[in-house]
């Protein structure tokens, strides 16, 4: 693939990924938890990973994240949430790619998806405790500890208060993210199957 064609494909996938961030295309998963919604912007990024390579996939993810800041900035929810999203999705796609880069089979894809989902969910839980929730509490006045009982204060980091809330983590963060990554896996798996069958695009070792 020529350098020009590669750059055009990166730009197109980044643009498509950004379009999928439109609020109208997002949807909640858990009843009563409207502040956490699924967006499918990772799908074009995964297509980039498996057609161009992991490095270009991260470039697409980075461009999408920058455009998210510029086009859909909603204050603290954006500047706190986007870095978390970048880290978790980066881990997810890197693990899936690692297990399928030699051969894209159902077995390898399933193993990759399961391990990637577990890793990404754990990372999101840790980031919620030590990064997101303290910042939301300070910058936006949003304190989940007032909604979900059972929080334990851990320590202070300057003006940030770090707490551990097992109720919120186990009933919201864990199921939401697990379901979200399962949706990503099913949608991308379907796309790979359709693209392979119709020879729309060549995936790595697929």
From Swiss-Prot:
Changing residue 68 to Y: Strong increase of the riboflavin dissociation constant. Riboflavin is stacked with one or more Trp residues in the binding pocket of RibU. This is Riboflavin transporter RibU. The keyword Ligase does not apply. The keyword Transmembrane helix applies. Forms a stable energy-coupling factor (ECF) transporter complex composed of a membrane-embedded substrate-binding protein (S component), 2 ATP-binding proteins (A component) and 2 transmembrane proteins (T component). May be able to interact with more than 1 S component at a time. The gene is ribU. Belongs to the prokaryotic riboflavin transporter (P-RFT) (TC 2.A.87) family. Induction: Induced by riboflavin deficiency. Inhibited by FMN and roseoflavin. Signal peptide: none annotated. Keywords: Cell membrane, Membrane, Transmembrane, Transmembrane helix, Transport. It is a multi-pass membrane protein. Probably a riboflavin-binding protein that interacts with the energy-coupling factor (ECF) ABC-transporter complex. Unlike classic ABC transporters this ECF transporter provides the energy necessary to transport a number of different substrates. The substrates themselves are bound by transmembrane, not extracytoplasmic soluble proteins. Mediates riboflavin uptake, probably also transports FMN and roseoflavin. InterPro entries: ECF_trnsprt_substrate-spec, RibU.
């Amino acid at each position: 693939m020529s350098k020009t064609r590669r750059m055009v494909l990166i730009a197109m996938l980044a643009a498509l990924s950004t379009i999928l961030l439109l609020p109208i295309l997002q949807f909640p998963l858990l009843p009563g938890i409207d502040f956490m919604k699924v967006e499918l912007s990772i799908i074009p990024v995964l297509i980039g990973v498996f057609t161009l390579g992991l490095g270009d996939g991260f470039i697409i993810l980075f461009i999408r994240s920058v455009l998210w800041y510029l086009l859909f900035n909603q204050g603290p929810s954006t500047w706190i949430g986007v870095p978390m999203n970048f880290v978790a999705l980066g881990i997810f796609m890197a693990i899936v790619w690692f297990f399928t880069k030699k051969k894209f089979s159902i077995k390898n894809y399933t193993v990759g998806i399961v391990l990637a989902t577990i890793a990404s969910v754990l990372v999101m839980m840790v980031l919620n405790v030590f990064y997101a929730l303290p910042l939301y509490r300070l910058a936006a006045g949003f304190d989940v500890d007032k909604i979900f009982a059972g929080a334990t204060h851990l320590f202070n980091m300057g003006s940030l208060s770090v707490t551990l809330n097992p109720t919120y983590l186990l009933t919201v963060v864990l199921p939401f993210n697990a379901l979200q990554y399962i949706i990503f896996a099913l949608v991308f798996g379907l796309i790979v199957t359709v693209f392979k069958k119709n020879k729309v695009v060549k995936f790595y070792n697929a």
